Structures are given as C-alpha cells and as structure tokens.
Amino acid sequence: MKQQKQKIRIRLKGFDQGQLDRSTADIVETAKRTGARVAGPIPLPTKREVYTVLRSPHVDKKSREQFEIRTHKRLIDILDPTGKTIDALKMLALPAGVDIKIKAA
C-alpha cells in the first residue's frame, strides 16, 4: 500500500513587494530548517487596478488623475512537513501588510 504524501500550500498576497519577499524568505527558511522540502516561492501574476478620478469637484471634466494599486502574489508548497515544521510556522510572526492563506492537501 502506497503512503499518501502530505503537502501544505501557502499563498501570500500584499501590496508591498519587498515586504512580501521578506515574508516568503522567512517561511522558506523556517521550513527548510525543520527538515521539510520546499517548492517555491513561485511568483504569481500581479493584479493591477487603476482608478480614475476627477481632479476638481465642480468643473473641468477633462482634467483627471489616475491611481493604481498593484497586488503581488506568491505561492509556496511545503512537501512532507513534520510536526516541528507546523509548530515553527505557527510561531512565525508576519507583518500586517501580508495576507496569508494556508491550505493542507
């Protein structure tokens, strides 16, 4: 009988690319230190949202200003995690600007 392999998939999302890269590096280093294999970080496509607003509250319809928000995403797969890996990931402190979703498969 074949033993089923365990995998943890972590998706990170944030507006600041530097903060996101530091967080992924922390997660990868923690997982490798506890003996798990790591696939990634895989950069996913960046979502770009552009908002156009009027510069003036009353007239000058042609005068507009554009703002954009870029959402950067990363994907990390942790293969064959141990109990130490899961405990270390729970104790890891991530910055407030990074959204994390963890899925066990």
From Swiss-Prot:
GO terms for cellular component: ribonucleoprotein complex; ribosome. GO terms for biological process: translation. Keywords: Ribonucleoprotein, Ribosomal protein. Gene3D superfamilies: Ribosomal protein S10 domain. GO terms for molecular function: structural constituent of ribosome; tRNA binding. Coiled coil: none annotated. It comes from the Bacteria. Belongs to the universal ribosomal protein uS10 family. Part of the 30S ribosomal subunit. Involved in the binding of tRNA to the ribosomes. This is Small ribosomal subunit protein uS10. The gene is rpsJ.
